[in-house]
């Protein structure tokens, strides 16, 4: 769902590496062929081309990442906007009359409404089931990714571990599982994916600090 972000990061990485190599080669040739004011002018021109190439790739790929995340936010919003089934309220009222619903009864009710956001949330709250992933959690996750991407494009060196980890590590894949499950109405899976994502990110932090 957000695999395009990894592609955009890789594109920016490759452009930056290539532009750096071209700049270093150009500077070497300039140093070998020019002196004085001409040396300074040619060096300035080479660096301007390098910076322009980097800026163009940065803007293009960063904007592509933001567009992908905006699409996720839009899909999540549509999921939340889905109305509850017409029979849900009566079902919930009937459930409230039971002092001790059986495991099978609980599974039946959950199974009937597990793909509707508000119905599933209400059932989980009433039956004290594991707290579902809310749309606010999804929006917070999106904000976290945006923060990390800004650092990748505007702070981190593309050869640094923190940048490469966004491409080579499991960060994006972990978020992708959460977003995909939520936007497909698989709210039970979203809970597991969110926990797995949090555990994975915490492990990445420990490895980085170690």
Describe the predicted segments one by one:
Residues 27-37, 135:
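Charged, low-complexity interaction regions
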Residues 85-210:
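A long, low-hydrophobicity, low-complexity, charged/polar interaction segment common
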Residues 1-11, 40-139:
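Long, charge-patterned amphipathic interaction tracts in eukaryotic proteins
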Residues 1-22, 30, 182:
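Core catalytic machinery and nucleic-acid-binding channels of phosphodiester-processing enzymes
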């Amino acid at each position: 769902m957000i695999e395009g972000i990894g592609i955009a990061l890789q594109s920016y990485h490759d452009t930056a590496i290539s532009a750096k190599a071209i700049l270093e080669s150009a500077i070497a040739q300039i140093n070998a062929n020019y002196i004085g004011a001409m040396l300074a002018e040619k060096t300035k021109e080479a660096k301007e081309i390098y910076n322009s190439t980097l800026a163009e790739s940065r803007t293009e790929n960063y904007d592509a990442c933001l567009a992908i995340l905006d699409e996720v936010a839009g899909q999540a919003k549509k999921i939340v906007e889905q109305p509850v089934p017409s029979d849900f309220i009566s079902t919930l009222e009937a459930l409230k009359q039971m002092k001790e619903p059986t495991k099978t009864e609980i599974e039946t009710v959950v199974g009937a409404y597990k793909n509707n956001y508000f119905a599933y949330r209400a059932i989980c709250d009433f039956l004290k089931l594991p707290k579902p992933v809310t749309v606010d959690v999804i929006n917070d996750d999106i904000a976290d990714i945006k923060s990390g991407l800004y650092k990748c494009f505007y702070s981190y060196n593309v050869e640094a571990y923190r940048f490469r980890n966004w491409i080579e590590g499991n960060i994006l894949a972990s978020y992708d599982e959460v977003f995909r499950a939520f936007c497909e109405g698989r709210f039970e899976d979203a809970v597991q994916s969110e926990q797995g994502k949090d555990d994975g990110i915490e492990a990445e932090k420990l490895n980085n600090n170690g």
